[in-house]
Swiss-Prot record:
Monomer. Keywords: DNA damage, DNA repair, DNA-binding, Glycosidase, Hydrolase, Lyase, Metal-binding, Multifunctional enzyme, Zinc, Zinc-finger. Its cofactor is Zn(2+). This is Formamidopyrimidine-DNA glycosylase. Involved in base excision repair of DNA damaged by oxidation or by mutagenic agents. Acts as a DNA glycosylase that recognizes and removes damaged bases. Has a preference for oxidized purines, such as 7,8-dihydro-8-oxoguanine (8-oxoG). Has AP (apurinic/apyrimidinic) lyase activity and introduces nicks in the DNA strand. Cleaves the DNA backbone by beta-delta elimination to generate a single-strand break at the site of the removed base with both 3'- and 5'-phosphates. A zinc finger (FPG-type) spans 236-270.
Length: 270
């Protein structure tokens, strides 16, 4: 599943091709994605793309009329192609520009989304409820500490809660907790303030490094130019069950927390 770094890498990849260009046509081949694609997305036709933004794992293609909102879901990909490029299986949506460039949305599992937000309308509820962005000053370890004081849930589940902070998905939660030396099973309220202050900084570093490396390619994710992400080469615990810990050489363990595979070193994480 594409997580925040992968979505940010996609944004960085498509932005230079879209910003300043006019949308000629939006082609919807399959309306039934996670939610039905609204007919109102066609209101963007004829308008210039002013910006391409990201909020959590949502991408906003801004025009004077409103914003096309894209979510990659479990397996979504965005490709920049010539508008004459033949479609392949699972190519559901084309955003065709007047210069012949096309942003093509492919989603094999159809858990992605294409929504519309008209200029002046309030934010869609699920977006308005999101917590702060992890790479901004609105998020830090103090926030984690303050919000965790009554939380009995495992700390890994806590930092993956989008109301606490957006974008700390399963891969990066595992990696951040390993670097911080925190057992992912530990109750959130039992983690010390000192540990949370360090964890806040580590989350920022891990996500920034993943973006710099082009995201993590495990199965479905590729960059907008079709190239893979390389952060998978730097994973220290995720997906390494049974292998030796890079620090102490103990065996990496795996359990399920919140229906997610969780990887950790019992010796290094307390």
């Amino acid at each position: 599943m594409p997580e925040l770094p992968e979505v940010e890498v996609s944004r960085l990849g498509i932005s230079p091709h879209l910003i300043g260009q006019h949308i000629e046509q939006i082609i919807v081949r399959h309306k039934q994605l996670r939610w039905w694609v609204p007919d109102d997305v066609h209101l963007a036709e004829g308008h210039k793309v002013n910006d391409v933004r990201r909020r959590a794992k949502y991408l906003f293609i801004d025009t004077d009329a409103g914003s096309i909102i894209l979510h990659l879901g479990m397996s979504g990909k965005l490709r920049i192609v010539n508008s004459e490029t033949p479609v392949i299986k699972h190519d559901h949506i084309d955003i065709v520009l007047t210069n012949g460039v096309c942003l093509r949305f492919n989603d094999a599992r159809r858990f992605g989304a294409c929504l519309w937000q008209r200029v002046g309308d309030p934010e869609i509820g699920m977006i308005a409820a999101l917590g702060p962005e992890p790479l901004t000053s609105d998020f830090d370890g103090q926030r984690l500490y303050d919000l965790s004081r009554t939380k009995n849930v495992p700390v890994k589940n806590f930092i993956m809660d989008n109301k606490v902070v957006v974008g700390v998905g399963n891969i990066y939660a595992n990696e951040s907790l390993f670097i911080a030396g925190i057992d992912p099973r530990k109750a959130a309220k039992k983690v010390s303030k000192k540990s949370y202050l360090a964890l806040g900084d580590i989350i920022k570093q891990v996500l920034a490094k993943a973006i710099e490396q082009g995201g993590t390619t495990l199965k479905d994710f590729t960059q907008a130019d079709g190239n893979p992400g390389y952060f998978a080469q730097h994973l220290r615990v995720y997906g390494r069950k049974g292998q030796a810990c890079e620090v102490c050489e103990s065996e990496i363990q795996s359990v399920t927390l919140g229906q997610r595979n969780t990887f950790f070193c019992e010796q290094c994480q307390k």
